[in-house]
Curated annotation (Swiss-Prot):
GO molecular function terms attached to this record: DNA binding; zinc ion binding
GO biological process, one term: DNA recombination
InterPro entries for the chain: DNA_Rcmb_RecR, Rcmb_RecR, Rcmb_RecR_Znf, TOPRIM_dom, TOPRIM_RecR
Coiled coil: none
Family per record: Belongs to the RecR family.
Keywords of this entry: DNA damage, DNA recombination, DNA repair, Metal-binding, Zinc, Zinc-finger
Chain's role: May play a role in DNA repair. It seems to be involved in an RecBC-independent recombinational process of DNA repair. It may act with RecF and RecO.
Keyword DNA repair appears in the UniProt entry: yes
Cited SUPFAM superfamilies: Recombination protein RecR
Protein name: Recombination protein RecR
Entry-linked PROSITE patterns: RECR, TOPRIM
Pfam families, per the entry: RecR_C, RecR_HhH, RecR_ZnF, Toprim_4
C4-type zinc finger span: 59-74
Length: 200
């Protein structure tokens, strides 16, 4: 029979165990670390979690996370407004920004088409993307979705949807492992994939 802890410690283990990428043993290690950590460190963590839940929202323009809308990327006049890079999640924006190779804007879909999880085009921020393409300022849309089945399905769907709009639609060059997530790609590989993008 598995050892279970009483009350607060088990609640903490269970809470950490619900986080992505944290298994039961990892959750237990983190919980016991927090138990022996200085009180101010535990308080800092709790306050940081509360603060992010209270202050962070999604940019009204691109869907990236921010404290005030528009986000710093959309508000930056130095960004190239003729290019929009479409990504699945805000974490993908961070991955691309780390490359220091991309200077355009972003559009965060909030996921990818996944029939197994009942996620269809209507569940994504596609109308916002189309609205941003209404003027003639945007010349290129880069599809930077995860190289997995869901990312490929979403890229294919959006490419067909955007062709009549008249913008150039490109996708990241090969080099990213199939079935992986953008957030796990190193900066050099991701930078080369951006630089070598090809017509979709």
């Amino acid at each position: 029979m598995a050892l279970a802890y009483d009350g607060a410690i088990q609640r903490l283990i269970d809470a950490f165990g619900r986080l992505p990428g944290i298994g039961p043993k990892g959750a237990q290690r983190i919980a016991f670390y927090m138990l022996s950590a200085p009180e101010d460190e535990a308080r800092d963590l709790a306050e940081a979690i509360e603060e992010v839940k209270a202050k962070i929202r999604f940019c009204d323009i691109c869907g990236n996370v921010c404290e005030s809308s528009p986000c710093p990327v959309c508000a930056d006049p130095r960004r190239d407004r003729s290019v929009i890079c479409v990504v699945e999640e805000p974490k993908d924006v961070m991955s691309i920004e780390r490359t220091r190779e991309y200077h355009g804007l972003y559009h965060v879909l909030g996921g990818a088409i996944n029939p197994m999880a009942n996620v269809g085009p209507a569940d994504l921020r596609i109308p916002g993307l189309l609205k941003r393409l209404e003027g003639d300022e945007v010349k290129e849309v880069i599809m930077a979705l995860d190289p997995n089945i869901e990312g490929e399905a979403t890229t294919s769907y959006l490419t067909q949807l955007l062709r009549p709009v008249g913008v150039k639609v490109t996708r990241l060059a090969s080099g990213l492992p199939v079935g992986s997530d953008l957030e796990y790609a190193d900066e050099i590989t991701l930078g080369r994939a951006l630089a070598g993008r090809r017509e979709a």
